[in-house]
Amino acid sequence: MIQPRFSLTPLALAAGLFAAGHAAAQTVPDTTGQPIQTVVVTASADASAQGLPSDYAGGQVARGGRLGLLGNVDMMDTPFNTTNYTHALIQDQQAKSVADVVQNDPSVRVARGFGNYQELYVIRGFAVNSDDLAYNGLYGLLPRQFVASELLERVEVFRGANSFVNGAAPGGGGIGGMINLLPKRAPNAPLNQVTLGGESSGQVYGAVDIGRRFGPENRAGLRVNAVRREGETAVDAEERELSVFSVGADYRGQGFRVSADAGYQNHKLENARP
């Protein structure tokens, strides 16, 4: 039996090697010229790696906010109705308290409590007492009756089934929604801000806001706020005094974040209109 024999000529062998080399070259990805993604760490009251949701166009509201156990959620991804007011709006409108901020929301009405002078917020027809305001997602940490805006980085208004994601408010309110207040944190750049003001009624105002970051990679931060307001208001014979001091500290570690807040507020109102 005759067995056929096959032999490669030099030309065929060279063509085979060229084809193999060409195929191998296509399997190696080209990594030259690819940009390296830059990770920017920003200071925020939120412990997640992403930090607070970014500002919307104009900077006075944010694109998202905290939804209790769901964490920070973009406004286009949540089944609830939320509005998240930033520190820029607080400064632009010279808001004095939480009431001045939430009055921008058409679904929120502001009143005073029965028999006292606490701020009362009505969301979708249901009352939310100032006792039921949340501070960084937690109840029972804020002063009763009045919260100065100088303590706050953001004011988040949640409208809907509040207890489903945030838990029941201790005061029994919050049926139609809730208000969550976010504390200030030291920014990446040094902050030195002094504000002085006065009103035609005779009330004078002064505030100091200082923020610094320390240590390796600016991991530790400190934010200090001090406020003093005194004098007559726009209401005849009514006088208001306000003293506020707060300190917010935070540390950004490898895979964890730690923060602490301490504050003092003394609000005095004389000859107030009921």
Kindly give the residue locations of the regions a language model identified.
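Short, compositionally biased, intrinsically disordered N-terminal export/targeting signals
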Residues: 36-37, 224
